[in-house]
């Protein structure tokens, strides 16, 4: 399925976060076969930064799966969490991705047919169901990462997840 809106038009202001054009952003986990993707940095008024990464796949096939070998490293150290969004809650994951000597905190979920999935098996099932019911296999991997931090406090995770929760309803306007 096609995107509802072009990802390049995604908001540059989200709550008290503003796009940061100075930051060089690269995706931590690549979906090399993604049909549409973007990585953007946002900065809060207190200087905190987050990177938002969205990788959208129109169709999946063997070797080009949304949930597969490419995303397996995300799940190795993942712990479930819940994003509090306006209508309720969205399941997500917390994980740490090691890049060189840096440990990067990441909140991520799969966005399939307007629903967020943290569990990779449920995400795969949702894709299969969507293929049978709607004849499509599209979906997205959404990641919110921050700079490495010394403290792994609950408060730091909550702030990161608050940004992720603000992103979720906006994604509904873009992703099918």
PLM regions: where:
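Short, solvent-exposed recognition patches
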Residues: 18-21, 25-130
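Alpha-helical transmembrane signal-anchor/signal-peptide segments
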Residues: 1-14
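Short glycine/proline-enriched loop/turn "hinge" motifs that connect secondary-structure elements
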Residues: 131-137
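Surface-exposed amphipathic alpha-helical segments
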Residues: 139-176
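Envelope-exposed proteins and targeting segments
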Residues: 13, 38, 48, 138-140
């Amino acid at each position: 399925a096609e995107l509802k809106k072009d990802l390049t038009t995604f908001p540059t202001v989200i709550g008290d976060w503003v796009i940061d054009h100075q930051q060089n952003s690269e995706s931590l986990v690549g979906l090399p076969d993604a049909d549409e993707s973007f990585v953007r940095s946002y900065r809060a008024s207190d200087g905190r930064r987050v990177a938002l990464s969205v990788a959208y796949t129109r169709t999946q096939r063997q070797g080009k799966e949304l949930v597969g070998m490419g995303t397996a490293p995300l799940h190795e150290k993942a712990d479930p969490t819940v994003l509090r969004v306006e209508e309720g809650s969205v399941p997500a994951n917390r994980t740490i991705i090691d890049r060189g000597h840096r440990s990067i905190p990441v909140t991520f979920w799969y966005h399939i047919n307007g629903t967020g999935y943290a569990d990779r098996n449920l995400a795969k099932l949702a894709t299969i169901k969507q293929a049978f019911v709607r004849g499509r296999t599209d979906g997205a991997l959404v990641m919110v990462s921050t700079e490495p931090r010394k403290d792994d406090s609950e408060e730091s995770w909550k702030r990161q997840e608050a940004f992720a929760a603000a992103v979720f309803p906006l994604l509904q306007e873009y992703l099918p």
